[in-house]
Amino acid sequence: MIETFQAVLPHGITLSCRASGPAGAPVLLFLHGFPEAAFVWDELLEHFGTRYRCVAPNLRGFEQSSSPKEPEAYRVKHLMADVEALIAQVSPGGAPLEALVAHDWGGAVAWSFAVQRPQLLKRLVIVNSPHPATFLRELKNNPVQQAASAYMNFLCRPDAEALLAADDFRRMWPMFTNMGAADPARKGGGWLTPQVREQYRAVWGAGLTGGCNYYRASPLRPPTSPDDAIMKLEFAPEFVTVKVPTLVIWAEEDSALPPSLIDGLEAYIPALRLVRVPGATHWIVHEQPELVAGEIERALAA
């Protein structure tokens, strides 16, 4: 059974959360991406809730969580502060998480969190979220990735949220349907049911500025000229090396995040287990929750 609560954090942010499992049990924390919300983890919360306290916050800017208007409030350091404060609230005695599980933008936060706060988690699980070093490499050098990520520059437009909300979110649905979400003949397809559409309408109707601000605040987006700041950006190894055991689940038919993003990943993650999933798309959590749960089970047992 899924419960909901409001986590009021000491630095003035409130996160609306979904949870399952007994209070006092070891904690699994799940971070969603864009344009999703905490509800995408419900099947995993119920699966693991028999043994763990499972918590999935709506990140700042999503659903009923605090949604600051200024893009600067969505820099990773602020998002990490939310996660750290939430862990202090939900983890008994401040014990480290059994696992931090994250997808898409949640993964962008989780990569940095694992590097900078390794004492707060025992293991990291990433689902189709590019490591910052390989993402930077591909954005700078790979025309395929530059084209696949071109939407990021659109989402930085000052009118992006108005355009996305127009005509019953007409520009939003193709993010899902272009990867087979409404096609029951496709493996894992057909998950975008009328009920799920209503869940998304409710989330998006609460506001899209927060979600767009993640892109506005990020230095990682495709260059539009050779002089763009990203072309001069470099990451020192100590800022991108993950020292906790890490599972990366990578759906190979992700049209926004091609598999080239996992090439060379082992250079940044000494304790890496990589699971490639042919035929699955960016929305693998919707498509194949049993597979995702099974791989997380293996990681927890290791």
Question: Where are the predicted features?
Answer:
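Flexible "cap/lid" subdomain of the alpha/beta-hydrolase fold that forms the substrate-access gate
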Residues: 2, 15, 55, 62-101, ...
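Short acidic-hydrophobic surface loop/beta-edge motif
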Residues: 3-10
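Short, flexible hinge/linker loops that cap or flank conserved catalytic cores
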Residues: 9, 21-23, 48, 238-242
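A short loop-to-beta-strand scaffold at the N-terminal edge of the catalytic core in hydrolase folds
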Residues: 11-19
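Conserved HGGG/HGGXW glycine-rich cap/lid loop of the alpha/beta-hydrolase fold
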Residues: 18-67
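Active-site helix-initiating loop/hinge in glycosyltransferases
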Residues: 33, 75, 287-288
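Short active-site segment of divalent metal-dependent hydrolases/proteases
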Residues: 35, 106, 285
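Catalytic histidine-centered segment of alpha/beta-hydrolase-like enzymes
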Residues: 280-289, 293
